[in-house]
Amino acid sequence: MRISSLLFLTFLAGIVQAQDFLAMFKPFLGGGGGGGNPFANPQAIGGLFQQFAGGNGGGFGQLLAGAMAPKPAPAAAGPRSAPAPTNEDYNTDIDVPAPKAKARAAPTPRRAQADAPPVYRQPRTKAEKIERFRNIARTFSPFVYEVNTTPAPHFDNFIWQQNAPAVTPEPFTFAPFSFPTLATVAPPAPGPGGPTLEPFLPTTASPKLLAHNTARMIREIASFSDGGRSRDQDFGAVQTLMQAFFEAVSSGNNGGAGAAAGAGTALGDAPMLQAHRDGTELGANRALTNKLFESDMVLTVKQMKAIVLAAQEARNPHGRKKRKVITGSVYRWKSVIPFRFKGGDAKWKKLIREGLGLWEKETCVRWSENGPGKDYVIFFRGSGCYSSVGRTGGSQLISIGYGCEDKGIVAHEVGHSLGFWHEQSRPDRDDYIHLRKDWIIKGTDGNFEKRSWEEIEDMGVPYDVGSVMHYGSNAFTKDWDQITIETKDSRYQGTIGQRQKLSFIDVKQVNRLYCNSVCPVALPCMHGGYPDPNNCAVCKCPDGLGGKLCGRAAKGTDHDKCGGELTATAEWQEMVYKGKRTCNWKVKSPSGGRVRLVLTELRYQCAPACKAYIEIKHNTDFQQTGFRVCCFNKTYDVISDQSEALILSNANIVDYEVSYKLQWIQDNGKALPPPKPTSTWVPGKENRPFRGVENSGGTIEKFILQAIPKIRDSHRPLESITSIVAEYGLATLLGISHNGK
């Protein structure tokens, strides 16, 4: 007891001697509002804190009001933008460089005097101590509090506004403390500046955090792209032009079933904009809808102005035309393209190199990691999948973020950096696809605008629904069960949006733009082939064709076991395949007539954009991708436009066996015959080409069975029983039904 009293007296003495002790707690005590006696109402802990809060002149109310005051309002979209939030606001592993602050000049040290007293660290002032304690309190304060709703900051979800209305917070009130459950702060209501967007990863984040996600993308663009750092050229100016463009071309989607199903929906509706893995970059970028042009293109002010002017010229056909200002040779790289990594782990970097390797394998374009040059590309793991278009000067970016981890998506974004736009923006797209505008998200119509022939360079190649640069079927859809792009020929629906490989036309465009002078000697290549810039002695052939001049079927993974040349005759022929190989078949009619193909059976994994598939090329131009089938719901009956047709079976990327049955004949008007006995070639297993199908028996089996003596004599019971048993056993062995049919 005496020890306790002694400790208590020592504590009181320390209080008297501490000159700054009461000053440190002065902000917690009641001020002009009347203060509060901490022991006046000791019935509850919550009451104790309420008394500490005091009146309007001081207490925890004033302290927490400062700690929880609304952050600065976002800045308006315009040519200049305020810095976006720092990296700590986001779940990322990259290091986005912050804008460099102006360095302060270090004070010149004074020369020490011989008789000068030693210099010690100056003690903190009262104000510094108070501020330090406030910072600690903001971090560790356990109080439960409720926010009096005040007008939310004015923001439009993609850039901070500079002239936001001032918001004066009302005093905070406190609810009784309830241990251990802590209440959460109510998020601010969406401001009138625009709808909110759902973040890339599905969460229940507040609109303020969603605005941060988009602001982070703008910070990335400003940090990694030199093209947007000059005055009136930053991405804020681009977005101002882009939003005006979207509003000008928006159709409103006011009619049709899609409009009725989507009544009341808006661009910012959260469920509609959550990320969706559809195998394309558009699915991963849903949260950035209308913040990037056509979902994944970072344009310069010059490029965006050209698009706006072209849209105006399209509505005024008598005006002056702008030519080739946004793509093609205007933004072509000069030689080897330097690139650098910013952050990322080894697996992510390997994926980038594989995507670049797809282009290097098929073209003369080469990429140099950390190579020299003032113009270069920075790969980083950003807010989504997006890229600059063409060479824009200085450093430019390609973001391969979470959800974009596919080498086909990498190849797509690299295609943009080489100077190419989306395939469906070509002027001739209406000959191949149809837009279902009723199902397009309202306000995103501008992402489907066609370019004019004056704006683009098609490099003399036809439209290709199988291009790696083509939108998928569900681009900008308000309902994932409904497609927005429908192919005119329904058989090609499973072809668009593929990200498995570069198409022949993708490669040919790049080679014509970058490699046209590599091979000085022309070759008489067939079917649209051309000298291969990686080997000028042979032709670069369309998919499915090979040989020096593209005159025969290309070799598959096992050319000796599947693939080759087939001849169509006046009689039906049939092929049944089962395995996991890539095979290429060329079917030709020797008399110059057309070829009829019938696909009667198919076993592949069904997908919106086929990964493993049967591809049939039956048109006159073998450069274009054929129609790909992986979802079998009907028999495909095709007649070729010429005397040849190609069948490509792609199954080497799957871990299961695929199978299909194909019949062909020289087209002469004959009806498809009933199924005949066929030979099923199963690589690596026993093959019996004489076996019948469906237990009906073939010619050889029936001949063997009929050659057995049939004894049915009641006077010879032993021989009769032996004959019946032998006939039954042999029929079972040969796969023939026991009724003899």
Swiss-Prot record:
GO terms for molecular function: metalloendopeptidase activity; zinc ion binding. Disulfide bonds join 364-515, 385-404, 519-539, 541-550, 562-583, 610-630. Residues 550-648 form the CUB domain. Residues 539-550 form the EGF-like domain. Residues 71-122 are annotated as: Disordered. Keywords: Disulfide bond, EGF-like domain, Glycoprotein, Hydrolase, Metal-binding, Metalloprotease, Protease, Zinc, Zymogen. It comes from the Eukaryota. The active site is at residue 413. Residues 71-85, 97-118 have a biased composition (Low complexity). Glycans are attached at residue 633. SMART domains: CUB, ZnMc. It holds the Pfam family Astacin. Coiled coil: none annotated. Zn(2+) binds at residues 412, 416, 422. Its EC number is 3.4.24.-. Its cofactor is Zn(2+). SUPFAM superfamilies: Metalloproteases ('zincins'), catalytic domain, Spermadhesin, CUB domain. Binds 1 zinc ion per subunit. Residues 324-516 form the Peptidase M12A domain. GO terms for biological process: proteolysis. PANTHER family: DISCOIDIN, CUB, EGF, LAMININ , AND ZINC METALLOPROTEASE DOMAIN CONTAINING (PTHR10127), ZINC METALLOPROTEINASE NAS-30 (PTHR10127:SF898). Metalloprotease. This is Zinc metalloproteinase nas-30. It comes from Caenorhabditis elegans. The gene is nas-30.
